[in-house]
A protein has these predicted regions:
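N-terminal secretory signal peptides that target proteins for export/translocation
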Residues: 1-4
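Bacterial N-terminal signal peptides
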Residues: 7-18
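Compositionally biased alpha-helical segments
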Residues: 20-149, 154-157
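Flexible, glycine-rich phosphate/dinucleotide-binding loops
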Residues: 46, 180, 267
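Short, flexible beta-strand-to-coil junctions
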Residues: 52-54, 174-178, 337-340
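Juxtacatalytic substrate-recognition/specificity segment
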Residues: 113-250, 358-362
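Acidic/His/Gly-enriched intrinsically disordered linker/tail segments
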Residues: 195-202, 226, 245-397
């Protein structure tokens, strides 16, 4: 009897895991049409499918599929949610170490169309000029390391957990800054994330000069000697789940998270997370490590009330970007590392996943504390690290 129960249990576990292990699947709609595709995400009653035939992502209503496919999609969502729930309980990483010898595959080279496509394990790089495998490998390491960092953070951002075999994040590379700007890149930027609903996770656009590539003869060589915080920042946006852009989190947390990853000391495929506190403080209050970059807010910061700051429209947040990004970094770091544990930020992120937003979600973060008490705790924590934050009176209280 015991053996029968054990076999039944094992079979049940295998059946539960099967949908998670499958790659592409033949989906059938109610009219009998078939499509070979892989799920990239599901939101409410819409599923995004990466179609094998053309490599593009399409959004479809769940209702158009036959019952067995709808059940498969629901099971896929359930498995993703289980993975997210487990990730919340993982320890905070101290070191992200990425393999430097990553495999690069050339999937398309079309001189006439100026389209050259390269695959690393989790990224698709689409460039308007030919690059060697070795050059792509050099800069792809930073992309892969950033994704691994986001995957290891116990914040359950599912986009960082989707295997490259199912969905590669798209990166558009441009030979010239002029071409980058013509295609929508901000003139003063070194890279940008553009959210596109029908393009899966959106795209990141980067001019080659931002990757440290220099033209030598008819080819390119990698000669990057500086620090690149813009690219990890934009890559984090590409990997951040949509729920974390909801009101109450959009701005202070979505940008604070991107800043947190970007300022982490990085070298040769390694993010040294254990060294983050000094890097966070130096970047937010000064000009960063070695005087490169930084928000330079100073050691005494006069801030809006916490409630007004967290609930301000995103357009207002970006209108004063340098200050708000720096303060967002300090506050995000507080919730990650300066409370007794991460239970409050975890509960807040879970609430966002469940559909809460705005003040309703922030009440979960406060966990019974008043806004005045929350401000006092943040101020006290940072004062002990040499940063004095003074919050103004709220205009909405």
């Amino acid at each position: 009897m015991y053996m029968m129960k054990l076999v039944t249990l094992l079979l049940g576990c295998l059946l539960m895991l099967a949908p998670c292990e499958l790659g592409a699947r033949m989906f059938t709609d109610v009219d009998g049409s078939k499509i070979d595709a892989t799920i990239t995400k599901v939101e409410k009653d819409t599923v995004s499918l990466l179609v094998k035939a053309d490599g593009k992502v399409y959004d479809s209503r769940l209702s158009i599929f036959r019952p067995n496919d709808r059940n498969y999609i629901r099971e896929w969502v359930r498995r993703q949610e289980l993975e997210a729930a487990y990730n919340f309980d993982d320890p905070w990483p101290t070191l992200i170490n990425t393999d430097l010898d990553i495999e690069i595959e050339i999937t398309e080279e079309d001189e006439e169309k100026k389209r050259f496509v390269y695959h690393s394990p989790n990224y698709e790089f689409i460039c308007d000029v030919r690059l060697s495998k070795n050059v792509v490998k050099k800069f792809a390491t930073l992309f892969e390391a950033t994704r691994e960092y986001c995957r290891m953070l116990p914040i359950a951002t599912l986009k960082a957990h989707v295997p490259g075999a199912q969905f590669r994040n798209k990166i558009l590379l441009f030979e010239s800054k002029a071409s980058y700007v013509r295609n929508g890149g901000p003139p003063s930027s070194a890279g940008v994330f553009i959210s596109r609903g029908r393009q899966g996770n959106g795209i990141v656009m980067v001019p080659l000069e931002s990757l440290g590539l220099k033209k030598v003869g008819s080819g390119y060589m990698y000669d990057y000697k500086g620090e690149n915080k813009v690219l990890p920042h934009e890559l984090v946006h590409q990997l951040t789940d949509r729920e974390y852009y909801r009101s109450g989190a959009r701005g202070w947390f979505s940008e604070g998270l991107a800043e947190y990853v970007a300022v982490t000391p990085y070298r040769s495929g390694k993010f040294m997370v254990r060294s983050n506190l000094s890097a966070v403080k130096a970047y937010a209050t000064e000009y960063g490590k070695k005087g490169k970059g930084g928000r330079a807010l100073g050691d005494e910061i006069i801030a809006p009330s916490l409630k007004d700051y967290m609930l301000q429209p995103y357009s207002e947040f970006t209108a004063n970007a340098n200050f708000n990004y720096g303060l967002g970094l300090l506050i995000t770091n507080y919730y990650f590392h300066m409370e007794e544990d991460r239970s409050n930020i975890t509960a807040f992120l879970r609430a966002l996943k469940r559909g809460k937003q705005g003040e309703e979600a922030l009440r979960v973060l406060l966990n019974g504390r008043s806004w005045d008490e929350m401000e006092e705790q943040i101020t006290k924590a940072w004062r002990s690290r040499g940063v004095k934050i003074t919050f103004r009176e709220s205009v909405s209280r």
